[in-house]
Amino acid sequence: MAGSPSRAAGRRLQLPLLCLFLQGATAVLFAVFVRYNHKTDAALWHRGNYSNADNEFYFRYPSFQDVHAMVFVGFGFLMVFLQRYGFSSVGFTFLLAAFALQWSTLVQGFLHSFHSGHIHVGVESMINADFCAGAVLISFGAVLGKTGPAQLLLMALLEVVLFGINEFVLLHLLGVRDAGGSMTIHTFGAYFGLVLSRVLYRPQLEKSKHRQGSVYHSDLFAMIGTIFLWIFWPSFNSALTALGAGQHRTALNTYYSLAASTLGTFALSALVGEDGRLDMVHIQNAALAGGVVVGTSSEMMLTPFGALAAGFLAGTVSTLGYKFFTPILESKFKVQDTCGVHNLHGMPGVLGALLGVLVAGLATHEAYGDGLESVFPLIAEGQRSATSQAMLQLFGLFVTLMFASVGGGLGGLLLKLPFLDSPPDSQCYEDQVHWQVPGEHEDEAQRPLRVEEADTQA
């Protein structure tokens, strides 16, 4: 029986036990394998007779701060638009990112920085871990309100591994360039989440339809997330690019692309809106598509005009997606995309990957000069042509879509295990299922919810 004492006890213990197990296992693995790198270790750094001003901390940490704020504040508040799910949006973002950054340090460390029997970490490890956490949070947006915290932690456990493998294949085996993660972060996270949502499809989700909308103050809080993301996105795309002209160019291209996507979003929102009025959903999300679409190409010689054109296109495509494609996605394809990650991350991510194919194919020694080595080292060394680089960029997109689709399917099957607690159809998008909500009174909509109600569950 759904409401039996044994099930209630299991639900009470599920999250604490899983958190303790995952943190304990991670701590043991850190103790065995993780060590400071030579720029962090006291003895190794001073043995090299370096100046403290040469430490990468001073070059990379400002970007890390911005990326960190995007992950924990930007993503968290962007998802508080649901009128009864603000605690869960911010709280589960906090939980997922805190676990994902630890687990990804291990996974990425084994793949990228494992030597002499240890993983060596520094500030770049922190940035890479936050990038991985960002992909997990993108996937979270697709299933927001329909999953429990234990399910989300297991999703992160699987997704981080697949993210790390996909990133390793693209960046190290194929030599793909993807500085801002149009493919490795946005496309992967979006389609992993969308396939996951398809596997977890709820035919009776209409029972919670009254909670799916926003109210005035929840949309206002969500705009805080939008502004944080918009301001810091140039740092996100440029955080790990080559110091100097490459990093400068990446930030500049992202800056202009975001500005153009914002104007494109306002224009299309008014054009397709009822009586020419703006839709806050479009402004909160599609205005950010400019940061996604130049993720791959922002370190390349995209040109300021190219950045503006790409951003404007991404903003318009994303807005049209929210207006027309999201309803089709649910009615025809049975994908219930809560946050519209397909419109903000999926389509702009694919467009960004294709833009990277185009710009890589146009790369020449004349255009880049000595800077070709930092952007396309294999072309500079004569190991491949610009056309070959472009073809591998395109192949990298297909590899990412494959990893995301297979991973999302496996994740959906994992999250459907019967012993995992998830909210019934009539209690989705409701904080009271998982949180003590202060100030609640006796009206029917806000009474303590009964988990024993018989509904279809994910």
Swiss-Prot record:
Glycan attachment points: 49
- Where is it chiefly localized? membrane
Q: What role is this protein assigned?
A: Ammonium transporter involved in the maintenance of acid-base homeostasis. Transports ammonium and its related derivative methylammonium across the basolateral plasma membrane of epithelial cells likely contributing to renal transepithelial ammonia transport and ammonia metabolism. May transport either NH4(+) or NH3 ammonia species predominantly mediating an electrogenic NH4(+) transport. May act as a CO2 channel providing for renal acid secretion.
Could you describe the post-translational modifications of this protein?
N-glycosylated.
**Segments for region (Disordered):** 439-458
Find motif (Basolateral sorting signal) and give its ranges.
429-432
Q: Name one GO biological process term.
A: ammonium homeostasis
Which family is this protein grouped under? Belongs to the ammonium transporter (TC 2.A.49) family. Rh subfamily.
Task: Give the Basic and acidic residues compositional bias ranges.
Answer: 444-458
The UniProt keyword set, sorted, is: Ammonia transport, Cell membrane, Glycoprotein, Membrane, Transmembrane, Transmembrane helix, Transport
- Segments passing through the bilayer: 14-34, 62-82, 87-107, 125-145, 150-170, 179-201, 220-240, 252-272, 283-303, 305-325, 347-367, 394-414
Task: List the ranges whose topology is Cytoplasmic.
Answer: 1-13, 83-86, 146-149, 202-219, 273-282, 326-346, 415-458
User: Which proteins does it associate with, and in what oligomeric form?
Assistant: Interacts (via C-terminus) with ANK2 and ANK3; required for targeting to the basolateral membrane.
Tell me the compartments it is located in. Answer: Cell membrane; Basolateral cell membrane
Reaction(s) this enzyme catalyzes, per UniProt: NH4(+)(in) = NH4(+)(out); methylamine(out) = methylamine(in); CO2(out) = CO2(in)
Q: Which residues lie on this side of the membrane: Extracellular?
A: 35-61, 108-124, 171-178, 241-251, 304, 368-393
Name of protein: Ammonium transporter Rh type B
What molecular function does GO assign, one term?
ammonium channel activity
Its membrane topology is listed as: Multi-pass membrane protein
**Region annotated Interaction with ANK3, chain positions:** 416-424
Q: Look up and give the organism this protein is from.
A: Papio hamadryas
Q: Which InterPro entries is this protein grouped with? A: Ammonium/urea_transptr, NH4_transpt_AmtB-like_dom, RhesusRHD
Enumerate the SUPFAM superfamilies for this protein. Answer: Ammonium transporter
